[in-house]
């Protein structure tokens, strides 16, 4: 039966758990480029994650192990910034596109969903505390990187090109969603605390190491990386 199966797995060094949590963070260039003069507002939005994973302890004392699993997660944020000579491609009212250097305000909405495979090394400090670190690979399922520009002007093609003003109650949209990479990867590190016999509290930091945009996308002139802290609860079988 199910109980005997779990006991037998534990005797052979296997552990299983399911996790549910939320992520706080953002997608950002590191460091902030000179074009971004100030961050006026930031909203992490509600980003949920669900995960099933398994740990294989690889020596008799169960100090060291390997963890892998599958995680369904979202990475979100909303920001508003003031920029100068920021590369931009806006969508005009007639559906056409204007490309150039934007000076003014930029609002950004990031809302992406991923299927993620972590591969981590685990170290058991004691019966309650576990540390984990390793790498992850993510495949994007749903993608959005869009927003508006307002209270400023666009210099077409280059910083000295024709000036297109967007001021007052006017704004223009941009949408780079189709330019997001399908595959992303990075590093992950975190800790678990066993609060009760089967219930854990965990915190994991993930840091992307490749640009979220495709290699041939040049409108945004700097790389952007997803950096998120995931906090939640786990049930250990």
Task: Give the residues covered by each predicted segment.
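Outer-membrane beta-barrel "beta-signal"
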Residues: 193-194, 225-237
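Repeated loop/turn-to-beta-strand initiation elements of outer-membrane beta-barrel proteins
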Residues: 62-66, 128-131, 197-203
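Detector for outer-membrane/organellar transmembrane beta-barrel domains
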Residues: 57, 65, 114-160
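Outer-membrane beta-barrel architecture
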Residues: 51-55, 118-120, 190, 232-234
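Cleavable N-terminal export/targeting peptides
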Residues: 1-11
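Extracellular/periplasm-exposed beta-strand and loop segments of Gram-negative cell-envelope proteins
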Residues: 26-45, 75-112, 140-184, 188, ...
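Transmembrane beta-barrel strands of outer-membrane/channel proteins
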Residues: 18-24, 68-74, 133-139, 187-189, ...
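Outer-membrane beta-barrel channels and translocator barrels
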Residues: 11, 55-61, 126, 196-198
């Amino acid at each position: 039966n199910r109980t005997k199966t779990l006991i037998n797995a534990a005797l052979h060094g296997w552990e299983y758990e399911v996790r549910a949590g939320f992520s706080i963070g953002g997608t950002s260039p590191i460091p902030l480029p000179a074009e971004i003069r100030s961050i006026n507002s930031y909203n992490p939005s509600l980003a949920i994650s669900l995960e099933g994973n398994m740990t294989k302890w690889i020596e008799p004392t169960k100090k060291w192990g390997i963890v892998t699993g599958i995680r369904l997660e979202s990475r979100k944020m909303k920001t508003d910034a003031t920029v100068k000579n920021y590369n931009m491609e806006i969508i005009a009212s007639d559906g056409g596109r204007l490309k150039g250097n934007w000076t003014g305000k930029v609002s950004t909405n990031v809302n992406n969903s991923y299927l993620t495979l972590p591969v981590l090394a685990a170290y058991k400090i004691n019966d309650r505390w576990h540390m984990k670190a390793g790498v992850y690979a993510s495949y994007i399922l749903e993608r959005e990187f869009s927003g508006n520009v307002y209270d400023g002007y666009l210099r077409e093609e280059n910083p000295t090109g024709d000036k297109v003003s967007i001021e007052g109650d006017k704004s223009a949209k941009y949408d780079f969603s189709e330019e997001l990479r399908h595959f992303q990867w990075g590093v992950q590190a975190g800790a678990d605390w066993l609060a009760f016999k089967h219930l854990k509290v965990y915190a994991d930091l993930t840091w992307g190491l490749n640009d979220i945009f495709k290699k041939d996308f040049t409108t945004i002139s700097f790389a952007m990386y997803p950096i998120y802290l995931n906090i939640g609860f786990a049930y250990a079988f």
